Amino acid sequence: MERKKVIILIIGIYTIIQLIILLGFGYTPYPDSQGYIICAKDALSYNQFYPAKETLYSLPFLWNIGSINMVAVSLKLFHSITPILIIYSLLKGFTLYIVYQISKNLLGIRIASITCLIYILYPANYGEGTSLLSEVPFVFFCLTGIYASIKGNYLMGGLLMGCADYFRPIAIIFILAFILYQIRNHKGYLKLCLGYAFVISTIGLCNYCCKGEYIYKAKTGWMALAQYHWDNDGEHIGMSPMNLTNDHHLTFSQKDEKWKDLFLDWLKDHKKEYLQQIPIKIAKTYISDNVNMCTFLSQEEKNKDYMYESLSINNMLHSFPKYSFAQWITLYNLIYYYGIIITFMLSLKYIRRLKLAWFVVLIGTTFIALLGHGEARFHIPYMPFIIMCSAYYISNFKKQTL
């Protein structure tokens, strides 16, 4: 059987497994996922999509608009979130196909095949379709945008990046990475930026006409940054930034400006503390890869107030070897994940060949270090590129040892 048919068959099996996991383990109620449902129902109670005009002052903050409105559409049409879970499970399969195509175009068919193999053996790639988290649609649109741009369809690439931003507001990382990758292709990346600008401006103008606010993506960055550094500053001077969420005299845009001011005011006198937190944020982002393993928890554990408890690194260390099914999968996933990360780091010697992938990871990590807060979920959008680099290193290592 020729290679292309084998790859299609593998991707098909991978997609079917995603659907089987959804059927067998059901919905995973991550806190954010549950929050999206609440926000969607609230907006629909006003017969609108998120954010409803009447809630501009009562909303604590503006969350991931695209993800919430996907829930709203599903609830409005089907009175259920199951259709989205099925769509997300299918998107996982399409995403693998795009990862394969990007890798093939950049690095050749041999590396693409190894990338595909590493990808399907990576446990964290299973189960994402059992929740409403933003990673699945965001990664799909970003990767499809990258692929379109690699193939020379820059305008379409920009449009897809704009769609990704609607689900999670960090598509700019992938746009910047591609601009650096093709730094001399001015016409190409200008078209990419125009496509992106068209989508976000269209969404923004539609919301301005309907709701009186120019909004096209989530506004949680300054809130998270201000709260993170307040929490990790031993002095705890002034009020907690999260207290602003209860101020119903401010719109979510005004709250966002307040959080920005709070953080910048804090930064003036705490530059040392800010710099000291940078390696901690990076460590928190990459040290663990247990989030998606919650899919395999029992229903009883999923219903706990802190669902992640049994899968935390500390709990895993203390429980060994008396593990549950989910904990054994988590252990395997961690070993596999660390193997990917190690081979990715070793691929630095091939950075000239792996420029695009390394640009994505470096820019994304820089954003987390300077403008974000450390969280295990935050490395997920970069894993396809990390896996490509890992595959390239493994392929070259194998050649050298033969």
For every predicted segment, state its role.
Residues 61, 65-73, 77-94, 128, ...:
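Loop-to-helix entry region of an early transmembrane alpha helix in multi-pass inner-membrane enzymes
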Residues 98-101, 118, 137-154, 161, ...:
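Specific aromatic-rich, kink-prone transmembrane helix
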Residues 23-34, 38, 45-69, 73-76, ...:
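Membrane-proximal lumenal/periplasmic loop motifs of glycosylation machinery
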Residues 83, 280-358, 362:
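Membrane-interface anchor segments at the N-terminal boundary of transmembrane helices
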Residues 21-50, 189-261, 265, 288:
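Juxtamembrane membrane-water interface segments immediately following transmembrane helices
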Residues 124-137:
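Short acidic/glycine- and proline-prone juxtamembrane loop motifs at membrane-interface regions
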Residues 11-15, 112-121, 147, 161-165:
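Short helix- or helix-capping micro-motifs
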Residues 83-106, 144, 342-346:
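Transmembrane-helix motifs of polytopic, lipid-linked glycan transferases
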